[in-house]
């Protein structure tokens, strides 16, 4: 019983050391299908990760207009993850198909 109380007290002490308001980064998925990003617009928090998954038969990229991320070539079944740290709106596109566009809004 004493070990349980000591373990509980140690766990509480560790929790107390965490910064107030600290949040865990979230993971988001954008699917590439039908020559479109789905969803085409996504809102995330700074530090979150976006995984782009290509479900099309054609190769695609997800390339930020401002150069902040680029998945490189994704063939069918491939995926790539990017983490965005700075707040703001980031437009991105597929380098192979100019009509494929999306926006990431980072808060």
Feature roles, as predicted:
Residues 2-8, 12-107:
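Extracytoplasmic copper-binding redox domains, predominantly the cupredoxin/blue-copper superfamily
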């Amino acid at each position: 019983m004493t070990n349980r109380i000591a373990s509980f007290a140690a766990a509480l002490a560790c929790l107390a050391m965490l910064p107030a308001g600290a949040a865990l980064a979230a993971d988001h998925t954008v699917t590439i299908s039908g020559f479109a990003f789905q969803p085409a617009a996504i809102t995330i928090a700074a530090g979150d990760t976006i995984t782009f998954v290509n479900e099309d038969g054609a190769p695609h990229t997800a390339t930020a207009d401002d150069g902040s991320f680029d998945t490189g070539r994704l063939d069918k079944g491939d995926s790539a993850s990017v983490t965005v740290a700075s707040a703001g709106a980031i437009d991105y596109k597929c380098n192979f198909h100019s009509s494929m566009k999306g926006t990431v809004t980072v808060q």
